From Swiss-Prot:
Gene: CHRNA7
Chief location category: membrane
PTM annotation, UniProt: Glycosylations at Asn-46, Asn-90 and Asn-133 are essential for TMEM35A/NACHO-mediated proper subunit assembly and trafficking to the cell membrane.
Protein source organism: Macaca mulatta
One annotated GO biological process: response to cold
Keywords from the UniProt entry: Calcium, Cell membrane, Disulfide bond, Glycoprotein, Ion channel, Ion transport, Ligand-gated ion channel, Membrane, Metal-binding, Postsynaptic cell membrane, Receptor, Signal, Synapse, Transmembrane, Transmembrane helix, Transport
Signal peptide: 1-22
Positions annotated with a glycan in the UniProt record: N46, N90, N133
Family assignment from sequence similarity: Belongs to the ligand-gated ion channel (TC 1.A.9) family. Acetylcholine receptor (TC 1.A.9.1) subfamily. Alpha-7/CHRNA7 sub-subfamily.
Protein name per Swiss-Prot or TrEMBL: Neuronal acetylcholine receptor subunit alpha-7
Region described as Essential for TMEM35A/NACHO-mediated proper subunit assembly and trafficking to cell membrane: 260-267
């Protein structure tokens, strides 16, 4: 029992002695390493040889892409490693001490910065400790939220792919003093973004010569390639715009008598203007390229604007004043003949044929009316009823040998009657008959003028219907072509639709 307790106490004392010796070795090692160490001195064995620094990064998150200010915000961990000739020791002389850590400013480290930084502090990294092992290998892993300037190409927005460069290099050391070598970027810990899909982050090492110095300045450039996810913009911008474009076509289906054709066109035009303002708020104020969605909105606004102009013409045709003159011959030929035939449109009542009355030929003349004046009054009144309404539409039907009534009207003799109705003197007889004949002339002329005015108005209204139908077909085809042609012109349209809308 006493022997076992003694063994436990011996083991505990040995472990405490080992810890105390290790802490003593670390303290001694730190003193030896920083003794006569100058953090401004480049840690190489031969000053004529460059110090090789390996550089890489680990992308964790794409935090924001500011299209208007053209700034990319990312969460990145930098990875830098080099060999410090003055920070080496023999592990056997310092047992248990394999690695040591030095804070910022105590040992030398490369001054690698982001060249295209858009941050106010320029250096956005958090200065962590430098990890050093016994062979002098130094590893520096500073994390940071980087804001870099990036040219945002909005040519294919919202089906665009952006390429933002992150250029890193030493600020004060040239290629003869510091040899910067690239290692592949790490995206194993990347957190997916709701707005962007990370395509890749390839890197490239290059050297650049400046006018101040003869030596080259190496740099490592990583290109963050990302594709915009279009589901949000499709549901909030594209689909509403397509629906509004379809509403613009309803202007041509709305009857002209409703009085709302112009109002509908102006409302659709204002709706598109609101969507254009939404796009302008997020797009950069650049004249290098016009966004794809802006092109689509502009084409749609042109269609709606032209529809409003055409609607004004249609309303002018529909409400044309008959006293303003008849339709020009070329307008009648183009609209009422060619376009109406092409659109398979016919005038209202054009196919209606009045039934022919099967009666024997009756010749009614004013002479017979005059002869009937001496007859009983009922006979003369019955004949006078037809005298007043003969030729109301300005057409006089010639008598036929088989039937005396054609197209629902009596075939009257055009010789003596027309002479009387157009100012001829009635035969001598009853003066009341002359007054009645004068009233009949006035009524016939009045109805004839009304029929002519109605015919002119009907002709203009039919022309308005033809223009409406023609513009409906033309604008529908143009809208479909613009929608398919503009949106599908994006290089990755199919990929975006298959991934985001599937």
């Amino acid at each position: 029992m006493r022997c076992s307790q003694g063994g436990v106490w011996l083991a505990l004392a040995a472990s405490l002695l080992h810890v105390s010796l290790q802490g003593e070795f670390q303290r001694k090692l730190y003193k030896e390493l920083v003794k006569n160490y100058n953090p401004l001195e480049r840690p190489v064995a031969n000053d004529s040889q460059p110090l090789t620094v390996y550089f890489s990064l680990s992308l964790l998150q794409i935090m924001d892409v500011d299209e208007k200010n053209q700034v990319l915000t990312t969460n990145i961990w930098l990875q830098m490693s080099w060999t410090d000739h003055y920070l080496q020791w023999n592990v056997s002389e310092y047992p248990g001490v394999k690695t040591v850590r030095f804070p910022d400013g105590q040992i030398w480290k490369p001054d690698i910065l982001l060249y295209n930084s858009a941050d106010e502090r320029f250096d956005a990294t958090f200065h962590t400790n430098v990890l050093v092992n016994s062979s002098g290998h130094c590893q520096y892993l500073p994390p940071g939220i980087f804001k870099s300037s990036c040219y945002i190409d909005v040519r294919w927005f919202p089906f665009d792919v952006q390429h933002c460069k992150l250029k890193f290099g030493s600020w004060s050391y040239g290629g003869w003093s510091l040899d910067l070598q690239m290692q592949e970027a790490d995206i194993s810990g990347y957190i997916p973004s709701g707005e962007w899909d990370l395509v890749g982050i390839p890197g490239k090492r290059s050297e650049k010569f400046y006018e101040c110095c003869k030596e080259p300045y190496p740099d490592v450039t990583f290109t963050v390639t990302m594709r915009r996810r279009t589901l949000y913009y499709g549901l909030n911008l594209l689909i509403p715009c397509v629906l509004i474009s379809a509403l613009a076509l309803l202007v041509f289906l709305l009857p002209a008598d409703s009085g709302e054709k112009i109002s509908l066109g102006i409302t659709v035009l204002l709706s598109l203007t609101v969507f254009m303002l939404l796009v302008a708020e997020i797009m950069p104020a650049t004249s290098d390229s016009v966004p794809l969605i802006a092109q689509y909105f502009a084409s749609t606004m042109i269609i709606v604007g032209l529809s409003v102009v055409v609607t004004v013409i249609v309303l002018q045709y529909h409400h044309h004043d008959p006293d303003g003159g008849k339709m020009p011959k070329w307008t009648r030929v183009i609209l009422l003949n060619w376009c109406a035939w092409f659109l398979r449109m016919k005038r209202p009542g054009e196919d209606k044929v009045r039934p022919a009355c099967q009666h024997k030929q009756r010749r009614c003349s004013l002479a017979s009316v005059e002869m009937s004046a001496v007859a009983p009054p009922p006979a003369s009144n019955g004949n006078l009823l037809y005298i007043g309404f003969r030729g109301l539409d300005g057409m006089h039907c010639a008598p036929t040998p088989d039937s005396g009534v054609v197209c629902g009207r009596m075939a009257c003799s055009p010789t003596h009657d027309e002479h009387l109705l157009h100012g001829g003197q009635p035969p001598e007889g009853d003066p009341d008959l002359a007054k009645i004949l004068e009233e009949v002339r006035y009524i016939a002329n009045r109805f004839r003028c009304q029929d002519e005015s109605e015919a002119v108005c009907s002709e203009w209204k039919f022309a308005a219907c033809v223009v409406d139908r023609l513009c409906l077909m033309a604008f529908s085809v143009f809208t479909i072509i613009c929608t398919i042609g503009i949106l599908m012109s994006a290089p990755n349209f199919v990929e975006a639709v298959s991934k985001d809308f599937a």
